[in-house]
Amino acid sequence: MSPSTETEMEDTKPSVVENGDQAVSRFAEFSKNELALDEKSCKEAMDLFGETKHLLMANVSSMGNGTIEEAERYWFAFILYSIKRLTQKNEESEKEEIENTGLTLCRILRAAKLNIADFFKELPQFVVKAGPILSNRFGSDWENKLEAKEMHANTIHLKILSKYYKRVFEEFFVSTDANVENESSVTGRVSECHRFGWLLFLALRVHAFSRFKDLVTCTNGLISIMAILIIHVPARFRNFNIQDSARFVKKSSKGVDLLASLCNIYNTSEDELRKTMEQANNLVADILKKTPCLASECETENLEDFDKDGLTYFKDLMEESSLASSLNILENDYDQMTRNKGELDERLFINEDDSLLASGSLSGGSSVSAGGVKRKYDLMMSPSKTIISPLSPQRSPASHANGIPGSTNSKIAATPVSTAMTTAKWLRTVISPLPSKPSQELERFLTSCDRDITSEVVRRAQIILQAIFPSSPLGDRCVTGSLQSANLMDNIWAEQRRLEAMKLYYRLLATMCRAEAQILGNNLTSLLTNERFHRCMLACSAELVLATHKTVTMLFPAVLERTGITAFDLSKVIESFIRYEESLPRELRRHLNSLEERLLESLVWEKGSSMYNSLAVARPALSAEINRLSMLAEPMPSLDEIAMHINFSCGGLPPVPSLPKPETLPAQNGDMRSPKRLCTENRNVLAERNSFTSPVKDRLLHLSNLKSKLLPPPLQSAFASPTKPNPGGGGETCAETGISVFFSKIVKLGAVRISGMVERLQLSQQTRENVYSLFQRILNQRTSLFFNRHIDQIILCCFYGVAKISQLNLTFREIIYNYRKQPQCKPQVFRSVFVDWSPARRNGGARHRTGQEHIDIISFYNEVFIPSVKPLLVELGPGGATVRSDQVPEANSKTDGHLVQNPGSPRISPFPSLPDMSPKKVSAAHNVYVSPLRSSKMDALISHSSKSYYACVGESTHAYQSPSKDLTAINNRLNSNRKVRGPLKFDDVDVGLVSDSMVANSLYLQNGSSASSSGAPLKSEQPDS
């Protein structure tokens, strides 16, 4: 391999000729002239900019379009946003706080000519680069004070809620978009009513909810506002008939039950809706000074044919004479409540044309949509289409999930809001009715241990769930008048979520005990007395509850931090959750699958992961490097320590000393090095939970039934001490078995991502084999390259290394450009790669640097990757031995210290056979599945013997016309009365439907039995809300 092959790469960084001092001058002018900052704030901003200007100059090319002008605008906004958020948290003088009034994020963005999507897309890079400086200036908890992730998630919530509100509003009232000239006065009034509803909703958020409330609660709030509008907006503006039996299905002799009908349409809880509507009514009375009266005592056209029991009516609330003044009052109230918080003005979301809501670009500034222009919603959801989205629409639309039954809207695809409400309904109807204590079956398992551990299990659940869903001190933030404390509402919310998580935990624990008993017998002492196992179960239960409600303030990995476990611990129970909870909605199954993928790609490799404790035992040759980098997990905090940090305001917990410390429990995890994630350095960069983005639709770990039909290894071995012999025999320790399973998952994930990039880059199958072989060898022989990094960083380098050694015409720029189009892409993957320049790791390309830092992926490739993997690359080159992956021996004796494969290592294997299709069942009534089709399978599927089983767009039975026409033809054939091969009787109710698992398994068997699903999703543009 020639030196030029090793390190000569295209330079993607333009030279920065701008002097840092000139940037300082421009920033000073921007702060004073554009934003009119007061002297104190301006000085603070100038000081922070001066400290970080070298970072700006070094990262110009990686921000926005790569020009100095745009990079400066981003950096100006980041600095001012940080100053506003972090200094106001430290202000003790109310006078000083008021002096800085008016510097909101909206003002900053407008002055910098940036939109919201682009700002939050680039902000993580600033957080990584400037993190140490911000920590020195504002304290180690600066990131919690900044609340950047919460603000971003909150922004996405508001975006989809505003679209949802507009759609629902227009289902009941005339459209606000009408352009007919003679209807301008009508649409003007309706538009005012529409704005009134949104302002009342924001008042509800400000006064009654937390600042960052979950999506389900906010949706309940919007539906309660809609109920108020329905009975107050003048009847002449209605777009519905009260006698519409398909819309208002809940009726009695007294008339239509409005709230029950709305709950039926939008899957909301009637109890929660009534409580929220009562809060909204109180707001109308207290803020707008309107006098409430019982609807049953009012005679008005608006209430005709409604059941008036339980409804409150305000005379003249929406009449023209008072509407304008009410709007002004609500506007002023919002200004007063939010004017000094430095946040976004949430009123702007009602105006879709606002420049701040303009579409941002995907993944670093380049448009990547191959199918046309993406909608604003898609781009607001995330700067990059990542895998971690609890807001992704369901694949199979519910019959009435997103519209009024029987109306034209009832068949459209599920939206983030309707999906959230459907999933919340599962939690409400399936989990909430369960008892909040162990069932009799579970108690039998708990009492059959060497000692009765029932009380320990109950107490642990209370402590851990109290830590995850803490109660706020009462009266901490009360509002004036008769309105309730927002923190009182938070406490009620937290108690409800604790109960849901506890009931789910007990339910799953009983199911898992039943399954483990089939393997180990009825005595499950070793598993049920394992502290880490229970905390993982509780964390996973809580995460499902949080994902169901789309909670903004508890973004993953918060549950790990609050329970004292790590990503590696949690990854051991995810598959069991999916396997054993059969009622789990598809959305939550997908959430767990994508969560596992996220754990594998980066979180498990972070500093402080318990994976390193096992790896040091399974791979002794790596222990020195693990210890040098301080990668080992710290001891898991005891329940006593966690309990000390909790305010047990609800009481009912036994005294703390009654429970022995985890270190003394008989079946603990050996050395108790079960971790608490203390490493905050860069922990949120590559693994940030952008929980509201479009997901990789079940690309990996797609369906649990695609995995081996053999019984999984007992859970107790997964949670046993790393040095303990594996009960399954074979002479392995539990650490070796665990690392072997973990590495096999990494290899499968790598195979899926490599395959996706190969197809996108249109490379040969031999190149795919070489990249995959190199990736496996690095994992097994240069494992430390993965430490503190994202596996995609290694994959991208593998592609370029193989391209150079194979003399392919492929630049790193092309690789990164195409990687941006991958659904899991995050810009930080190629912009910020961890490196350690200590003498033990220094090589010829390190330029005598010292310490640790984050560099771009090209620098990482040249200075770290190539010096380490050069011998492995040489083997793949035309001048080398060209070793095929299936010919590599299990043990390699090369002298790197990391090269010898250990018993815990997976064997280097040829590229696995991955299922090509990820079927989507498109109808609950018909056995019809739709799946993307790879060109490699086209010939086989449309051969003479099999083509009748498939309908392929453009290639089925006639020449390609267009997707629309081909799909129409397919639909016509499916819906025709012509009998196709007798057994396929879609309209016969007695014919059993083919299950999703049967389809998945058939694909699995066709494509081999050793891989997980890659399942490229069927591409479709998602709805706006």
UniProtKB/Swiss-Prot annotation:
Region annotation (Disordered) ranges: 388-411, 885-912, 1006-1025
Region annotation Domain B: where it falls in the sequence: 737-871
Described function: Regulator of biological processes that recruits a histone deacetylase to control gene transcription. May play a role in the entry into mitosis, negatively regulating the cell proliferation. Formation of stable complexes with geminiviridae replication-associated proteins may create a cellular environment which favors viral DNA replication.
Matches recorded under PANTHER family: RE32990P-RELATED, RETINOBLASTOMA-ASSOCIATED PROTEIN RB -RELATED
Annotated compartments: Nucleus
Annotated keywords: Cell cycle, Nucleus, Repressor, Transcription, Transcription regulation
Protein family membership: Belongs to the retinoblastoma protein (RB) family.
Span list, region Domain A: 415-615
GO terms of biological process kind: cell differentiation; negative regulation of G1/S transition of mitotic cell cycle; regulation of transcription by RNA polymerase II
Alphabetical list of InterPro entries matching this protein: Cyclin-like_dom (IPR013763), Cyclin-like_sf (IPR036915), RB_A (IPR002720), RB_B (IPR002719), RB_fam (IPR028309), RB_N (IPR024599)
Membrane-crossing residue ranges in chain numbering: none
Pfam families for this protein: DUF3452, RB_A, RB_B
Gene Ontology CC, one term: chromatin
Region spans: Spacer: 616-736
Native organism: Medicago sativa (Alfalfa)
Gene name linked to the record: RBR
One Gene Ontology MF term: RNA polymerase II transcription regulatory region sequence-specific DNA binding
Name recorded for this polypeptide: Retinoblastoma-related protein
Pocket: region residues: 415-871
